Amino acid sequence: QTCALPIFKGWDWCSGYHYSDSIIIGFSHTHLSGTGCSDLGDILLMPYTGEVRTARGEQDNIEGAASSYYKHANEAVAPGYYSLLMDNGVKAELTATERVALHRYTYPSGSEHRLLINLKEGIGDKAYDTYLKKIDEYTIEGYRFSKGWSPRHKVFFTLKCDQPIESLAVFNDDEAAGNDELTGESVKGVITFKGDAPTALVKVAISSVSCENALANLRTELSHWDFDEVRNEAIDKWNDQLSCISIDTKDERAKKIFYTAMYHAFIAPTLYCDANGDFRGHDDKVYTNNTWKNYSTFSLWDTYRTLHPLFTIIKPQYVSDLVNSMLSIYDQQEKLPIWPLIGGETDQMPGYSAVPIIADAYLKGFTGFDADRAYRYMVASSVYEKQNG
């Protein structure tokens, strides 16, 4: 979920983007939606022109920073697409496949075209290990390891450009540290594009496992550079998702509210596996699975009453994958999930809300998971002595 990111200022900014803002520090690739805790905001990119700059700036002063002011009048938003003409003159457009974001930047003429890769910034978390390396004239790889609401969060990425990279200057926070490669706590890099082509396309593929898996995700899901094709495919996928319920009303406002709420309902749980089935577990081990898709971001104490029963009606193909994901988490941490987030257990909120979700799926006849195993895990989690509630 690629989106504009402002300066994080507390609880209201848990998802990153906030409509009250007028400053953008870049476009990040992982986000929460509707939560009361903050995290993610990984792999921040910021296009700009002119001299090399890496600083974020502050809310009351971004002079000399890479950040930019913006106006909502210059924004366009739709499921699967985001567009913003920033005050710095760069127009950014974003779309995505399941595991690969595609950026299209249109630069103003007359000065160097830059792209900041900022691995320090997130959404209320703390990066502790980051890495960037220029692989060739078009490719950069890296990772961002962080701790926040999730106690363990690792994002590897491969970035490919359609325009040649003239240079990659690397920085430890804002201190220059040479070119092409750096590992540290707060690594940043500035791409300078070769030539003066007005438009640059940038692919960013992510993985919880490795840079190699991120590259494999990119090759599997996005082998071409046709931005509009990817955008249209994303729109078609959202239309397919939202068309599972149709309403008949003359009240256009009510219809917008209904489908906006339905859109929000489909944002989480989130897909958490590579195209080959690999994913990183809560125990930091890599698991390989080819029979079901692994998911994370389960706000179970919020969702066991209504969202998961709704999925059994309108997304039955989804249900067994979710249950198998919960059973896999038990194998990783010896209890069913409480509030799992992208490779870590937050243990947020009391209770063991996975149990009624699994029971509901079983009683409704879903057979895509091992029922005996599920029952054992449900009983064990119900008497887990260290669990709150």
Identify the role of each PLM range.
Residues 1-389:
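Accessory carbohydrate-recognition regions in carbohydrate-active enzymes
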